[in-house]
Amino acid sequence: MIIIVTGTPGVGKTVASKKLSEALNLNYLSLSQFVIENKLYTEYDELRQSYIIDEDKVKEELEKIISTSHLVIETIYPSLVSTADLVVVLRKNPFSLYNELKGRGWADIKVAENVEAEILGVISQEAREAFKDKVCEVDTTEMSTEQILNKILNKQCDGPIEWLVDTKVQRFLEELDKIISSYENDI
């Protein structure tokens, strides 16, 4: 069995993935750690404080593990995983997510790009394109780890979640775009 837990940074993937793997007695794999430990990246982006992954190498190495294991895979790149029985996309209210990421001390550009990705449903869309009806979206806003885990185990999906129906979120997106645009010369 392969379960992918995905979503933008700050939505609760790590804790939920680890708890889910324990509850189902499956191995846990953080794809980010896997990439770093196996040097499956091409460079480090100083501005975003992130590694640029080598997608082909990641897919190749991941395939070796998937073919012989039962896993919960935590990732922001669901389409790099070739197969899954369930794909859980964790979502979070953009205002709450913004505060979470700012609290981590991340650069403004990194916060803005990740919150924008959440608002636009970038990871959700990627998951749906790759895995169609195997996708379950869960809104983690103001939920405990136990509540999130119960929703996943009971396949109580909230999605698809559309943040842009809220005019406050639309205005927030415009503000995020201004932040991102201010870095255009650095990108």
Curated annotation (Swiss-Prot):
<feature type="binding site">
    <location>
        <position position="12"/>
    </location>
    <ligand>
        <name>ATP</name>
    </ligand>
</feature>
<keyword id="KW-0690">Ribosome biogenesis</keyword>
<feature type="region of interest" description="NMP">
    <location>
        <begin position="30"/>
        <end position="53"/>
    </location>
</feature>
<dbReference type="InterPro" id="IPR020618">
    <property type="entry name" value="Adenyl_kinase_AK6"/>
</dbReference>
<feature type="binding site">
    <location>
        <position position="14"/>
    </location>
    <ligand>
        <name>ATP</name>
    </ligand>
</feature>
<keyword id="KW-0698">rRNA processing</keyword>
<dbReference type="GO" id="GO:0006364">
    <property type="term" value="P:rRNA processing"/>
</dbReference>
<dbReference type="InterPro" id="IPR027417">
    <property type="entry name" value="P-loop_NTPase"/>
</dbReference>
<comment type="subunit">
    <text>Interacts with uS11. Not a structural component of 40S pre-ribosomes, but transiently interacts with them by binding to uS11.</text>
</comment>
<feature type="binding site">
    <location>
        <position position="104"/>
    </location>
    <ligand>
        <name>ATP</name>
    </ligand>
</feature>
<protein>
    <recommendedName>
        <fullName>Putative adenylate kinase</fullName>
        <ecNumber>2.7.4.3</ecNumber>
    </recommendedName>
</protein>
<dbReference type="GO" id="GO:0016887">
    <property type="term" value="F:ATP hydrolysis activity"/>
</dbReference>
<keyword id="KW-0547">Nucleotide-binding</keyword>
<dbReference type="GO" id="GO:0004017">
    <property type="term" value="F:adenylate kinase activity"/>
</dbReference>
<keyword id="KW-0067">ATP-binding</keyword>
<comment type="similarity">
    <text>Belongs to the adenylate kinase family. AK6 subfamily.</text>
</comment>
<feature type="binding site">
    <location>
        <position position="10"/>
    </location>
    <ligand>
        <name>ATP</name>
    </ligand>
</feature>
<feature type="binding site">
    <location>
        <position position="15"/>
    </location>
    <ligand>
        <name>ATP</name>
    </ligand>
</feature>
<feature type="binding site">
    <location>
        <position position="13"/>
    </location>
    <ligand>
        <name>ATP</name>
    </ligand>
</feature>
<comment type="function">
    <text>Broad-specificity nucleoside monophosphate (NMP) kinase that catalyzes the reversible transfer of the terminal phosphate group between nucleoside triphosphates and monophosphates. Also has ATPase activity. Involved in the late maturation steps of the 30S ribosomal particles, specifically 16S rRNA maturation. While NMP activity is not required for ribosome maturation, ATPase activity is. Associates transiently with small ribosomal subunit protein uS11. ATP hydrolysis breaks the interaction with uS11.</text>
</comment>
<dbReference type="GO" id="GO:0042274">
    <property type="term" value="P:ribosomal small subunit biogenesis"/>
</dbReference>
<keyword id="KW-0808">Transferase</keyword>
<dbReference type="GO" id="GO:0005524">
    <property type="term" value="F:ATP binding"/>
</dbReference>
<feature type="region of interest" description="LID">
    <location>
        <begin position="103"/>
        <end position="113"/>
    </location>
</feature>
<dbReference type="Pfam" id="PF13238">
    <property type="entry name" value="AAA_18"/>
</dbReference>
<keyword id="KW-0418">Kinase</keyword>
